[in-house]
Regions:
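Acidic/histidine-rich catalytic cores of soluble enzymes
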Residues: 6, 69, 75-171, 175, ...
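Glycine-rich, aromatic-flanked loop segments that form ligand/cofactor-binding clefts
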Residues: 2-15
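Short acidic/polar active-site loop segments enriched in Thr and Asp
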Residues: 2, 53, 145
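Short acidic/histidine-rich active-site segments
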Residues: 183
Length: 183
């Protein structure tokens, strides 16, 4: 068995919805950013000790507006993680979900490090109502370095995520995702 990636979590409150999730998930919330950055860097060292060169995490609800006053400081944090991992020969991947494909693309471009990419969670883009995975590949496909296959349905209210379901019974269209990844 080959471990291809290490998913690195973080401490503090975590709420997986559209309201509290904005304030609790990933590196976006300023109240938890520094601590979580250090936890991700420690997790990356642990991954390296296991021989794993890819670190994945949810960064959180990236600002859609590039002029959001919190965006520059978030980029500094993400660039520090990317540069630290690069020095150790590791890649840093965004687990998809809370962000639109174009916002994720812009953020990767703005970080400007060659070791930054995408771990495509085929259900999360649906569960958060941000995209379908087939079309998302048109936007950030060249950055996909890992895939986390799941399936699900879009949200049916404005507060809670969509519903995750058994692979093949939701909207992910995994056959087309895989076909497109192999193009």
């Amino acid at each position: 068995i080959t471990i291809t990636a290490f998913w690195c979590g973080w401490t503090g409150p975590v709420v997986w919805n559209f309201y509290e999730g904005q304030e609790t998930l990933g590196l976006v919330p300023t109240a938890y950013r520094h601590q979580r950055m250090n936890e991700i860097l420690a997790g990356a060292k642990f991954a390296k000790s296991l021989g794993v060169n890819t670190v994945v995490t949810h960064v959180g609800f990236l600002p859609e507006n590039p002029y959001d006053p919190h965006y520059p400081a978030l980029l500094v944090c993400l660039r520090k993680i990317a540069e630290t991992l690069s020095a150790d020969g590791q890649d840093f991947l965004f687990e998809t979900g809370q962000e639109t494909p174009v916002t994720l693309l812009r953020t990767i471009e703005d970080i400007g490090c060659d070791n930054v990419g995408v771990n495509l969670d085929t259900a999360n883009v649906i569960l958060y109502g941000k995209a379908n995975p087939v079309d998302a590949l048109d936007v950030f496909g060249k950055y996909v370095r890992g895939v986390h296959c799941k399936d699900g349905f879009y949200p049916t209210n404005g507060r809670e995520l969509g519903r995750e379901v058994k692979i093949g019974s939701g909207k992910a269209n995994l056959r087309e995702v895989i076909r497109k990844l192999h193009k």
